[in-house]
């Protein structure tokens, strides 16, 4: 079977733990995920099964939505409360100035520096491994976009709740740090829940315990809304051998599905160049 599960990951469990448990529960040979969710965080994790593990790239560019809680005036090495507390401040804060800081990031594109404790690679080495060895490196910033950033509670006991809808590659831990910097203090992540990946919603996800085999979204079902190209038997043989297609078969700027004359799914094609297309996945 090839497809996807929408899983509600609990706190204190790694994304790898979820993969392992699903593999064990259903006796699948190949299982993967489309993007790590930190152990501190709960919420939506998309799990790929079978050949669909090769489709993780489809989710990479999707925006993500989170809700959670920031903690101010405390500095942790990991930028969340699971790390080592390095320093504290007693900076007086108000709802008014916190709201102004939130507003300054709303619908904003900016260069964000990922946390040192992250899976980002520097010269082929994951930064969290360097951090554990106390190795200091220059971390290149990456451009991110904050589509929506909202304070959802009153400030109380150095804490405030938030809602964030962000682009690919955005670290909420870094956002906590950067929000607090504008307030001349420290910021860390206290709680985090991922509620959406693109149009895939947490409300449609299940816990590992409640997950059933018929919850698997088949790869063919996932592509049901894509444009399709139906080819004859001769061209289908070429497609199965990895042949590129061009304007002689189709003209489009979007990915599409190739089907045979019986409307069976054969391959997923993506754009390579203008009027040139290549296969990225075979059903």
UniProtKB/Swiss-Prot annotation:
**Per its UniProt entry, what is the enzyme's top EC class, as one word?**
isomerase
Q: Where, if anywhere, are coiled coils annotated?
A: none
Q: Which residues form the active site?
A: 38
E.C. code: 5.4.99.25
Record's keyword terms, sorted: Isomerase, tRNA processing
The Swiss-Prot or TrEMBL record annotates one GO molecular function as:
tRNA pseudouridine(55) synthase activity
Report any Pfam family annotated for this entry: TruB_N
- Which superkingdom does the taxonomy of this entry point to? Bacteria
Give the protein's biological function. Answer: Responsible for synthesis of pseudouridine from uracil-55 in the psi GC loop of transfer RNAs.
Query: Which PANTHER family does this one have?
Result: PSEUDOURIDYLATE SYNTHASE TRUB1, TRNA-PSEUDOURIDINE SYNTHASE
- State the HAMAP family in the record: TruB_bact (MF_01080)
Q: Which family would the database say this protein is a member of?
A: Belongs to the pseudouridine synthase TruB family. Type 1 subfamily.
> What's the protein name?
tRNA pseudouridine synthase B
**Which organism encodes this protein?**
Onion yellows phytoplasma (strain OY-M)
Q: Which gene encodes it?
A: truB
